[in-house]
């Protein structure tokens, strides 16, 4: 084997080892975004829910600041239950439809059904809960104890 080929092979192996340490992106986040948009037709963009209160977005702690934030806590808890069932809610892809009455799930496996139900429940909760701009991008270290 030529030294240049060996170097290329070594570089590929090292890069693959490094890539294995990178956590996968949550694949169903796009689906959840579409469910939110379907349930909240003509409402605010779904990214407004990504950094709201103590529970909307990554992580969560303390007492939810309002009804909308409680929706996110319930969603987090629902994902926790899915994990206890052996599901991977952030990676589970499912089938859903956006009908005239709003979104609904149409999936085959137990994990798909459960995760879709979690997302659907949250999207509908977002639709009926008031959005308070004061709770967007809050200082969670002070308000989420």
Curated annotation (Swiss-Prot):
<feature type="disulfide bond">
    <location>
        <begin position="87"/>
        <end position="111"/>
    </location>
</feature>
<keyword id="KW-0442">Lipid degradation</keyword>
<dbReference type="InterPro" id="IPR036444">
    <property type="entry name" value="PLipase_A2_dom_sf"/>
</dbReference>
<feature type="disulfide bond">
    <location>
        <begin position="71"/>
        <end position="125"/>
    </location>
</feature>
<feature type="active site">
    <location>
        <position position="119"/>
    </location>
</feature>
<keyword id="KW-1015">Disulfide bond</keyword>
<keyword id="KW-0964">Secreted</keyword>
<keyword id="KW-0479">Metal-binding</keyword>
<feature type="disulfide bond">
    <location>
        <begin position="78"/>
        <end position="118"/>
    </location>
</feature>
<feature type="disulfide bond">
    <location>
        <begin position="54"/>
        <end position="144"/>
    </location>
</feature>
<feature type="disulfide bond">
    <location>
        <begin position="105"/>
        <end position="116"/>
    </location>
</feature>
<dbReference type="InterPro" id="IPR016090">
    <property type="entry name" value="PLipase_A2_dom"/>
</dbReference>
<keyword id="KW-0106">Calcium</keyword>
<dbReference type="InterPro" id="IPR033113">
    <property type="entry name" value="PLipase_A2_His_AS"/>
</dbReference>
<comment type="similarity">
    <text>Belongs to the phospholipase A2 family. Group I subfamily. D49 sub-subfamily.</text>
</comment>
<feature type="binding site">
    <location>
        <position position="76"/>
    </location>
    <ligand>
        <name>Ca(2+)</name>
    </ligand>
</feature>
<keyword id="KW-0443">Lipid metabolism</keyword>
<feature type="disulfide bond">
    <location>
        <begin position="56"/>
        <end position="72"/>
    </location>
</feature>
<feature type="disulfide bond">
    <location>
        <begin position="38"/>
        <end position="98"/>
    </location>
</feature>
<feature type="signal peptide">
    <location>
        <begin position="1"/>
        <end position="21"/>
    </location>
</feature>
<dbReference type="GO" id="GO:0006644">
    <property type="term" value="P:phospholipid metabolic process"/>
</dbReference>
<comment type="function">
    <text>PLA2 catalyzes the calcium-dependent hydrolysis of the 2-acyl groups in 3-sn-phosphoglycerides.</text>
</comment>
<feature type="binding site">
    <location>
        <position position="57"/>
    </location>
    <ligand>
        <name>Ca(2+)</name>
    </ligand>
</feature>
<dbReference type="InterPro" id="IPR033112">
    <property type="entry name" value="PLipase_A2_Asp_AS"/>
</dbReference>
<dbReference type="GO" id="GO:0050482">
    <property type="term" value="P:arachidonate secretion"/>
</dbReference>
<keyword id="KW-0378">Hydrolase</keyword>
<keyword id="KW-0732">Signal</keyword>
<feature type="propeptide">
    <location>
        <begin position="22"/>
        <end position="27"/>
    </location>
</feature>
<feature type="binding site">
    <location>
        <position position="59"/>
    </location>
    <ligand>
        <name>Ca(2+)</name>
    </ligand>
</feature>
<dbReference type="GO" id="GO:0005509">
    <property type="term" value="F:calcium ion binding"/>
</dbReference>
<dbReference type="GO" id="GO:0005543">
    <property type="term" value="F:phospholipid binding"/>
</dbReference>
<protein>
    <recommendedName>
        <fullName>Basic phospholipase A2 cPm08</fullName>
        <ecNumber>3.1.1.4</ecNumber>
    </recommendedName>
</protein>
<dbReference type="GO" id="GO:0005576">
    <property type="term" value="C:extracellular region"/>
</dbReference>
<dbReference type="InterPro" id="IPR001211">
    <property type="entry name" value="PLipase_A2"/>
</dbReference>
<dbReference type="Pfam" id="PF00068">
    <property type="entry name" value="Phospholip_A2_1"/>
</dbReference>
<feature type="active site">
    <location>
        <position position="75"/>
    </location>
</feature>
<dbReference type="GO" id="GO:0016042">
    <property type="term" value="P:lipid catabolic process"/>
</dbReference>
<dbReference type="GO" id="GO:0047498">
    <property type="term" value="F:calcium-dependent phospholipase A2 activity"/>
</dbReference>
<feature type="binding site">
    <location>
        <position position="55"/>
    </location>
    <ligand>
        <name>Ca(2+)</name>
    </ligand>
</feature>
């Amino acid at each position: 084997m030529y030294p240049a080929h060996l170097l290329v092979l070594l570089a590929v192996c090292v890069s693959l080892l490094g890539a294995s340490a990178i956590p996968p992106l949550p694949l169903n986040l796009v689906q959840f975004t579409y469910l939110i948009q379907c349930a909240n037709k003509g409402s605010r963009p779904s990214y407004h829910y990504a950094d709201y209160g103590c529970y909307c977005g990554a992580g969560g702690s303390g007492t939810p600041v309002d009804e909308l934030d409680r929706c996110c806590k319930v969603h987090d808890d629902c994902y926790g239950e899915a994990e206890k069932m052996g599901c991977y809610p952030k990676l589970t892809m499912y089938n859903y439809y956006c009908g005239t009455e709003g979104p609904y799930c149409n999936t085959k496996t137990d994990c798909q059904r459960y995760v879709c139900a979690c997302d659907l429940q949250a999207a509908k909760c977002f639709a009926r809960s008031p959005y308070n701009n004061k709770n967007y991008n809050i200082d969670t270290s002070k308000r989420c104890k």
